[in-house]
């Protein structure tokens, strides 16, 4: 039994994971950084020295030569699948990706169900980790509200993801549910006299325009750092 455990430890110690960081200054870059910091013994920034490729940003897979992908085991994260946009060209792109991937990773049941209709490869459904040094409860939310500029007695609705299509910067990105968000905001506008909406992230034009049309008070922090984002969650 001891020999078997030693062999397993030795096998794990030989794993060298390379992640294809998108360099977009967004959530996937943060996840990549956290992985590298917490798993230095099995991680590498050198593609050539890796034996496992984690395609954490499949939209940038073309930055890795296909010959390098074929030399190694490939583990690929699919963050979500927008079925309404999954046309002939998207299916063709996925078919090429699927030929190179050994196993997939998803973070939700919905994405797993969609992905199972497209591939026979193994799928691991597991949410992202939480770094509790960055995400934690703040005991005095009233102080945070004052610091940020949120009304002390306000009823807050927060939305921290993009909602607008990049092609025209005005059409709703329906897979993110901005139309449903506006419905909820309008409902609470009639219920709460001190409603205030807090937004972060890029491409919020659709929601912002709807808030202006309906004379709804809002705050917008386009690209926040982790410290401020944690404060917003606590407010």
Model-derived segments and spans:
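N-terminal pre-catalytic "stem/leader" segment of glycosyltransferase-like enzymes
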Residues: 1-66
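A conserved, positively charged/aromatic
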Residues: 87-102
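Donor nucleotide-sugar binding/catalytic pocket of nucleotide-sugar-dependent glycosyltransferases
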Residues: 102-116, 120-138, 156, 160
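Active-site proximal beta-strand in glycosyltransferases
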Residues: 49-57, 67-85, 104-106
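Short alpha-helical donor nucleotide-sugar binding micro-motif in glycosyltransferases
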Residues: 230-235
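Active-site donor-binding acidic/aromatic loop of nucleotide-activated sugar
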Residues: 196-200, 215-228
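A short beta-strand/loop micro-motif in the catalytic core of glycosyltransferases
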Residues: 53-54, 59, 100-109, 124, ...
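Conserved catalytic-core segment of nucleotide-activated headgroup transferases in glycan assembly
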Residues: 141-212
